[in-house]
């Protein structure tokens, strides 16, 4: 995979729930949108699953995921779960001419952004995770990140030691 979502960006969410997609992420979205030929690009925002953030996939990556779901036997609990949380609870999103999206109501609900917070102004954190990116409410992201690091690694440990289990 040549193109990847990397980095962490804090972006303002305005009173109309508009938020700018970080420019480096826009390039990856464009590269992963087979119909993109300039102008507006699209991606898929998934708000299903038991988590406090939404995940966003390029159109090409979502097509790969859908193929994997289709390969599961119909009617099985695993397939139904994935269909519901990855397909039903997902939205196609299109960037406007300024590289923004309107965070949909279901996405705002998942992030815990209230109407009052929108009026007063809030921030979202965009976190690149290789083949997808996550959108978090900024303060939730900071708290989760701190808690996760505390559990996974003792202070001063080499983070690459986590790769040793993969055999690479």
Swiss-Prot record:
Protein name as it appears in the record: Transcriptional regulator MraZ
Family: Belongs to the MraZ family.
Major location category of this protein: cytoplasm
Database matches in PROSITE patterns: SPOVT_ABRB
Name of the coding gene: mraZ
One Gene Ontology CC term in the entry: cytoplasm
Quaternary structure, from the entry: Forms oligomers.
Natural source organism: Cereibacter sphaeroides (strain ATCC 17023 / DSM 158 / JCM 6121 / CCUG 31486 / LMG 2827 / NBRC 12203 / NCIMB 8253 / ATH 2.4.1.)
Alphabetized CDD domains for the sequence: MraZ_C, MraZ_N
Gene3D superfamilies: Transcriptional regulator MraZ domain
Domain of life the protein comes from: Bacteria
NCBIfam families: PRK00326.2-2
Any one GO BP annotation for this protein: negative regulation of DNA-templated transcription initiation
SpoVT-AbrB domain residues: 8-51, 90-140
Gene Ontology terms for molecular function: DNA-binding transcription factor activity; transcription cis-regulatory region binding
Location relative to the cell: Cytoplasm, Nucleoid
Keywords assigned: Cytoplasm, DNA-binding, Repeat, Transcription, Transcription regulation
């Amino acid at each position: 995979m040549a193109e990847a979502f990397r980095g962490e960006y804090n972006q303002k969410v305005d009173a109309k729930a508009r938020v700018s997609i970080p420019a480096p992420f826009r390039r990856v979205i464009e590269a992963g949108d087979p119909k993109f030929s300039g102008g507006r690009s699209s991606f898929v925002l998934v708000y299903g699953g038991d988590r406090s953030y939404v995940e966003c996939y390029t159109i090409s990556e979502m097509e790969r995921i859908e193929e994997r779901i289709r390969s599961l036997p119909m009617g099985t609990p695993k397939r139904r779960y994935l269909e519901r949380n990855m397909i039903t609870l997902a939205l196609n999103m299109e960037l406007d001419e300024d590289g923004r999206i309107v965070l949909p109501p279901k996405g705002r609900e998942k992030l815990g952004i209230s109407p009052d917070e929108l009026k007063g102004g809030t921030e979202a954190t965009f976190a690149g995770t290789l083949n997808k990116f996550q959108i978090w409410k900024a303060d939730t992201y900071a708290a989760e990140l701190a808690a996760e690091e505390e559990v996974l690694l003792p202070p001063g440990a080499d983070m690459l030691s986590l790769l040793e289990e993969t055999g690479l």
